[in-house]
Amino acid sequence: MTRPGAGRWLLLRYLQVALLVRLACEGARVALVVLAVDRTGSAGFGGALVAALLVPGVVAAPPAGALADRVRRRRLFHAGCLVCYGAGLVVVAGAAGRAPAGVVLAVAGAAGCCTPLLTGGLTSLLGDLVPAAARGRAFSLDAVSYNLAGIAGPALASALAATTDSGLALAALGAAAVLGGLLVLALPLRPRSGGGRALRPADLGAAAALLLRDPPLRSLTWASAAGQAGTGALPVVCVLLADRYATPWAAGGLMTAMALGSLAGSLVYAWRPWGVRRPERTVAVMLLATGVPLAAVPAAPGVALAFGCFALAGCCTGPLFAALLAGRDRYAPEAARTQVFTLGASLKSTFAAGGAALAGVCQTAGPVRLVLAVAACQALAAALGTVLLRGPAARSRAVPLSGPASRSPDG
């Protein structure tokens, strides 16, 4: 049984790992481009490096999650993946512009195969580290780690590259990921009894079947992914809005406002969670709420009001993401929990990329129509979540506030 206060210390140790590896993950996207330009003079090669780091993670998410659900010694597996990711960044930092481009891209791709364990895979461990009654707050704080990394990671990479060297900047981020991986070894994850069974082809589809058949998981997964198609388009929309307001800084400033709002929303939700009995409903409500301030952006006469609208929308995405994480943990069975997390994260990334690409194709529609389309996408996603929640298991899957009683806090 967990001692009073022990869960708090375990959560703190987990958050140290999460911040280190996610700072590295977010910062690497900027550092890779800067490194490529410095060493080769080609921003295109930088884009190829970023793609090599990100795309394999989408493909590797199902097998990585399934393997994590089967492996017996979880600490070694998760620590090894994080260390390999960080080591890959360090190798790229030394080899870019000096070794053949194909070799450097292959190393980045190999590191990218580990990214599902930095995001959803790492989050899936919280259910084994934190007492059931504290998991709602724990997932909110984990959402904060994503927000902080998304804001601070690129800034840290830029600052390190400007003050030292682009290669050293990427190597430092890689070292942070390696340190995070080593700290995983201090987390009390017990070896699985009966673990180590060989991975079968049927195991790879276990989470996909759950996301299609289980009403709560189906609802929160596909609703959040559909909403992400809209928010994925926002970087393109913000560039067009900056031109509309004749304010160049608004291209990044509006996205920063949304990120800061999301951070604030996550902190408030961690302090006072709501809707914890049915997180899938919280996801749908927050999707709808996200679209309301975005729909008001066209009426904003100046960039200041648009900035406020984006910040308010961000305040809604913080609780949305925390409820999504809590819902995955609550409804995913033990045998497929990590795979549900990694596959869900992969779907969100895919939908976001699709939204960004579609916005780029449709940019001639103008910022007003595009931002209204993003707002409508959130409303449609909320409606989709409500429809997908219908099913024979929807009512029976509601669980008490304390969460599943069958899972011990220390795994």
Language-model regions: role of each:
Residues 128, 176-199, 387-398:
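Helix-loop junctions on the cytosolic side of multi-pass membrane transporters
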Residues 59, 63, 78, 84, ...:
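C-terminal transmembrane bundle of multi-pass solute transporters/carriers
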Residues 13, 17-29, 53-66, 81-82, ...:
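Substrate-agnostic recognition of the 12-TM MFS/MFS-like secondary transporter fold
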